[in-house]
Amino acid sequence: MSAAGDLRRRARLSRLVSFSASHRLHSPSLSDEENLRVFGKCNNPNGHGHNYKVVVTVHGEIDPVTGMVMNLTDLKEYMEEAIMKPLDHKNLDLDVPYFADAVSTTENVAVYIWESLQKLLPVGALYKVKVFETDNNIVVYKGE
């Protein structure tokens, strides 16, 4: 009998990455005047940039053999593929096809990351994606 007995314990595991990207908040559904009113300086035609931070949290049972919910090396590789390769040092609006049809708000960046990770992670493992556009502007997305 293990130290935990027959009880299968669950845990959440989080990993943080940082990436730099530029974008412009602009909706083709709005006039130029409405875009300026809604998005303010973030509607600058030349765009602007951020040093984003992303915390990805997975959850599951702690494996009784490895003692892990997920191998951190695997999580790092999933995040490299879903976040760093497509987003780091990119213009989100021009370089990431997803944002051809979606305004590149932090909310939509979080959804994009969630959807990208869902394709790579084991089913049911992804718990939440937390995107820091700045230290003060943060979006949490749980696939809802």
UniProtKB/Swiss-Prot annotation:
Q: Mention any Pfam family matching this sequence.
A: PTPS
The molecular function terms in GO held by this entry are:
6-pyruvoyltetrahydropterin synthase activity; identical protein binding; metal ion binding
Sorted keywords for this record are: Lyase, Metal-binding, Phosphoprotein, Tetrahydrobiopterin biosynthesis, Zinc
Q: What pathway or pathways are given for this protein in its record?
A: Cofactor biosynthesis; tetrahydrobiopterin biosynthesis; tetrahydrobiopterin from 7,8-dihydroneopterin triphosphate: step 1/3
Q: Which SUPFAM superfamilies match?
A: Tetrahydrobiopterin biosynthesis enzymes-like
Origin: domain of life: Eukaryota
Active-site annotation:
42, 89, 133
Question: Where, if anywhere, are coiled coils annotated?
Answer: none
Q: What is its EC number?
A: 4.2.3.12
Post-translationally, this protein is described as follows, namely: Phosphorylation of Ser-18 is required for maximal enzyme activity.
Residues where Phosphoserine is found: 18, 27
Which residues of the sequence carry a binding annotation for Zn(2+)?
Answer: 23, 48, 50
Note on cofactor? Binds 1 zinc ion per subunit.
GO BP terms: namely: tetrahydrobiopterin biosynthetic process; tetrahydrobiopterin metabolic process
Q: Which cofactor is recorded for it?
A: Zn(2+)
Query: Which InterPro entries does UniProt cross-reference here?
Result: 6-PTP_synth/QueD, 6-PTP_synth/QueD_sf, PTPS_Cys_AS, PTPS_His_AS
Q: Which GO terms describe its cellular component?
A: cytosol; mitochondrion
UniProt-listed PROSITE patterns: PTPS_1 (PS00987), PTPS_2 (PS00988)
Q: Which residues carry this modification: Phosphotyrosine?
A: 127
Q: Which reaction does it catalyse?
A: 7,8-dihydroneopterin 3'-triphosphate = 6-pyruvoyl-5,6,7,8-tetrahydropterin + triphosphate + H(+)
User: Note on file?
Assistant: The active site is at the interface between 2 subunits. The proton acceptor Cys is on one subunit, and the charge relay system is on the other subunit.
Protein family: Belongs to the PTPS family.
Per UniProt, subunit arrangement is: Homodimer. Homohexamer formed of two homotrimers in a head to head fashion.
Task: Explain the purpose of this protein.
Answer: Involved in the biosynthesis of tetrahydrobiopterin, an essential cofactor of aromatic amino acid hydroxylases. Catalyzes the transformation of 7,8-dihydroneopterin triphosphate into 6-pyruvoyl tetrahydropterin.
Q: Mind telling me which PANTHER family this protein's record contains?
A: 6-PYRUVOYL TETRAHYDROBIOPTERIN SYNTHASE, PYRUVOYL TETRAHYDROBIOPTERIN SYNTHASE
| Protein name as it appears in the record | 6-pyruvoyl tetrahydrobiopterin synthase
Q: Which organism is it from?
A: Mus musculus (Mouse)
